[in-house]
Amino acid sequence: MKIWMLIMFSMFPLTMFSQSADVLLRKVADALASGQTGYAVSLFRQSCQADGHEAEMFYWTEVDKSENTAPQFARELAEHFKDVRNYTKAYLFYKELLQYTPDNVDVLVSCAEMEVRCGKVADAKATYEQVVALDSDNLQACNFLGSYYFLKSEDARKKIEADFKKLSSPTRMQYARYRNNLSSLFDSGYSKARAYLQQVLTLFPSSEAGKTLEKIKLVEQEVNK
């Protein structure tokens, strides 16, 4: 008998045993009206799982943004869209959450992660710089910025060297300019990468950071010879 009950149960779609997003969102509205904020947030989390886009519409049209529950709802939407890999939407709601908590390091880091996922690398750099301004020991930010400045510097150095090699018979002035460009690049790029990666090593024994620092040391020797 139990086996037949299990077979019959498996034949019904799960939606028959779960609440739809619109039902959950009506309950969210009722919970908010009665002051049950914790329950409202819990219901909203369930509604995100049931239908994230319907929950999003509820947030934009029904939620009072001046209430304390608004940032909690924004967080639920951000985390839901991140979980389902809709990084554009997740980024939108982490940015929304920053409107409520602009100096929250965890939110800034999540926002930067989504910027990287969305291909907004320059924006991620700016966001991670905000992070280290608030928390100089943030491992993720230091690691990203160290790698960012190193890779950018490598690209710039290759261009400087390629341009110089195009000169069949460089003059003293052209050679001096070439050396000066390398020196300026080291000061503006490689040195920043080194500072961030050295900070990484004080926080975590990263072999990759150590290898990159060795490469920077070789570049410095070449620049200063």
Annotate each language-model stretch with its function.
Residues 17-61, 65-72:
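N-terminal leader/linker segments that initiate helical-solenoid repeat arrays
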Residues 47, 96-97, 130-131, 200:
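Canonical positions in the second alpha-helix
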Residues 52, 68, 102, 136-137, ...:
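Short coil turns that delineate tetratricopeptide repeat
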Residues 56-58, 73, 107, 141, ...:
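TPR alpha-solenoid repeat register
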Residues 58-67, 151-196:
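Short coil/linker segments at helix-helix boundaries
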Residues 59-62, 76, 110, 144, ...:
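Canonical tetratricopeptide repeat
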Residues 117-119, 146, 151-160, 221-224:
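Short coil/turn linking the two alpha-helices of tandem helical-hairpin repeats
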